[in-house]
Amino acid sequence: MTKYAFTLIIFLLGLIPQHAVAQLPEEELFLTEPDADDVGRHFTPDIFRYRVCFKDKAGSPYSLERPEEFLSVKSLARREKFGLKVDEYDLPVSPAYLKHLRDKGFRVLHQSKWNNSAVIETTDTLGAESLQEVDFIASVTRVWQAMQKKEEDSTLDYLTGFPVPDLTADTTRSVSPYGPNPHQVAHLGVDSLHAIGLRGQGVTIAVIDGGFKCADRIAGLRGVNIVGTKNFVDTGDIYATSGDHGTMVLSCLAAFQPFQLIGTAPRADYYLILSEDRASEYPVEEDAWCAAIEYADSVGVDLVNSSLGYTQFDTETMNHTYQDLDGQTAPCSRAASLAASRGIVVVNSAGNSGNDTWKLIGTPADGRDILAVGAVDDKGLNTFFSSLGPSIDGRIKPDVMALGDEVWVYDSEGQLTQADGTSFASPLLCGGVACLMQAFPTMKPTEIIRLVKASGHNAQHPDNVFGYGIPNLWKAFVEGQR
């Protein structure tokens, strides 16, 4: 697997006053919380996790005639607005099947209604593998095993190993309200949308990511309307984690500190959802991602940004292959595609593998009817690291491009930092899409995506380097009014 966080050049600005953050509504919706000691047990030998897939949802007390029992009012309203019916995929995993697993002594960590699966943790590998013989279980696959904790070097980018130069901080005030590089908003035409009052108001965005360290205390994020948080890695505070990748991604979307940094959707509402485990690289993170996006659906979000991707893992036999990139094979890709079919616009980073042996997009960027975003530099050229397409079934990937080179973000210390990666191209584009969704609240997500692609500079000749190109979202807005 390749994780997509490229923080290269550290600059300075701003310290971090406190601000209150709204607590998550009590809408657990049958998603299992990890145990409090989960983090400490990550590195205990002889612990394994398995993905258990079920054949059906028999024995469930839930019914398609009573969807209010497992979906929020807002989630149901989104489906109704777009003429989408609740179906079997939306029914929770059978509680009877989960009880069977617990009665056998397994700890249930995650569950996915869309994949009809659960993740169990155990030291009993023979017992887990014998579940294959249970008549309602379709498959059992190992997705994680305990390992030694990885050493982290603070002088390196925490995921990619790029050295961070020791540069003198620049405390000068920017000339533009958008900060040191107004182009990072203007290249998508989003500044023009902002100028007419389209800043994401009324749109709810879920940010599925790694750590959101100190995102609740950074001055430039003080005004963000965070309506809820959720942690699918452990039971810790998402703001107290050691990682700040999610914080940097959030600043691309939601920062609002004029003459320092303004994001592309500073007036949207946000759920911050932690699914990425920095301690190791295993397929179980895809299961956490599925739980995260299903949670986002259940609370009624309109839009998802995910700057995560999965291809290669700590155990090579678990790696994905190109044949998996069909939008339906990897669990997270299936979940992304199903989210799209439920009226959610999913925006995902294409990946940073363009210059390594993999070269291709990752999962869930191969999802169907979503926007996979590659990275360009300030001159509009594709970056050396931006992942390539197509999907195995021949779909154009990436779908579109946005600035992913020397993007200005806030780090966990509240300093302005320049970062590289499709991780940052994705939220810049996602925020612009939120502005379009504000302008056209009844427009179907598939039509929003069509407008975005059609506005790309490469729309007449889409390829598997640029996709449909760099969108001009002002052009998309004008077209949408016709």
Residue ranges of each PLM-predicted region?
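Substrate-binding/access-modulating region of protease and related hydrolase catalytic domains
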Residues: H194, F256-F259, L272-D366, I392-R395, ...
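Hydrolase catalytic cores
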Residues: L250-L253, Y271-D277, L360, G404-I470, ...
